[in-house]
A protein has these predicted regions:
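Conserved class I S-adenosyl-L-methionine
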Residues: 2-50, 61-65, 85-88, 107, 149-176, ...
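A short acidic, Gly/Pro-enriched loop at the edge of an enzyme's catalytic core
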Residues: 109-121
């Protein structure tokens, strides 16, 4: 296993939030992590023997499907800041006998890896956490080999609505200082916004497609699993125990009253192919 790289401040913040969320990450109510990770990989048409880098890999939602696709002759490297999520990913890989996937703790925005070393670079629901999204996308492009693909997947607008608004209205009622009117992913919720991000990173001819989606819960109470197993967790953990219970009761009560068990989960899939004529990046020999 490779050496861990030091984490930047944004990566440490993500580690705190998603490390805590790991205890709920594999609940059935959060099946969207695996579903959209697999959907991202399926769009790449990975060939057996390919090398794949999965940045902000979490519990393996996209790295594991990639490992299945490339087979034992290929190689997949997943990098994430949250050690507890990586532990989940390693356990899942071991259960499937996927010995050709490695999970490494580190800052996805500064891996220290040589340029052009991967047939595909993937980042699912992670690019918007970088302090400079365009710089992060450009770094991922640097790591993509000639003829390789860079896949970025982001959330579409209205994520988890109508439950999202119920949650934040409840937080504002209990502890106004923690109310958030804006989330990092709100900047790139359309196909055009994602294409613009590729362009700002110096990547030409990228494609992006918005796909509407719905996520169904067994009952409204299961939304609290999503709260504890996603980015909401940072807000919940900042509440006192009493406040946390007040927010939970408000959220669940309102969702039950409105019989809400279907959430909006629109997704935007972006891809770009690095021209075969592109020069190899420094530190990597030309491919044969």
């Amino acid at each position: 296993m490779g050496a861990e790289q030091p984490l930047g401040e944004h990566a440490r913040r993500a580690e705190r939030t998603y490390g805590a969320a790991a205890d709920h990450y594999r609940r059935a109510s959060l099946s969207f992590w695996d579903r959209f990770g697999a959907a991202t990989v399926s769009r790449l048409g990975l060939a057996p023997g390919s090398t794949v880098l999965d940045l902000c890999c979490g519990a393996g939602g996209s790295a594991l499907p990639a490992a299945r696709a490339v087979g034992p002759g290929g190689n997949v490297l997943g990098i994430d800041a949250a050690a507890s999520l990586l532990d989940l990913a390693r356990a899942r890989a071991a259960d499937e006998g996927l010995a050709h996937v490695e999970f490494r703790r580190g800052d996805a925005t500064r891996t220290g890896l040589p340029g052009g070393g991967f047939d595909a670079v993937v980042c699912v629901f992670g690019v918007f956490f970088a302090p400079d999204m365009a710089a992060f996308a450009a770094e991922m492009w640097r790591l993509t080999g000639a003829g390789g693909m860079l896949a970025l997947t982001t959330w579409g607008p209205g994520l988890f609505e109508p439950a999202n608004s119920v949650f934040w209205d409840s937080v504002r009622a209990v502890e106004p200082s923690l109310f958030k009117a804006f989330n990092p992913w709100d900047e790139i919720t359309t196909a055009q916004a994602l294409r613009d991000l590729y362009s700002r990173a110096g990547i030409a001819d990228a494609t992006a497609v918005a796909v509407p989606g719905r996520h169904h819960l067994d009952d409204p109470d299961r939304f609290w699993d999503i709260v504890l197993g996603s980015g909401y967790r940072a807000t919940v953990d900042a509440l006192s125990g009493a406040q946390r219970e007040q927010v939970r009761e408000r959220v669940i009560g309102r969702l039950r009253a409105r019989k809400i068990a279907t959430l909006r989960t629109d997704v935007v899939f972006g891809t770009a192919v690095r021209p075969v004529s592109a020069r190899p990046q420094p530190g990597l020999a030309a491919r044969t």
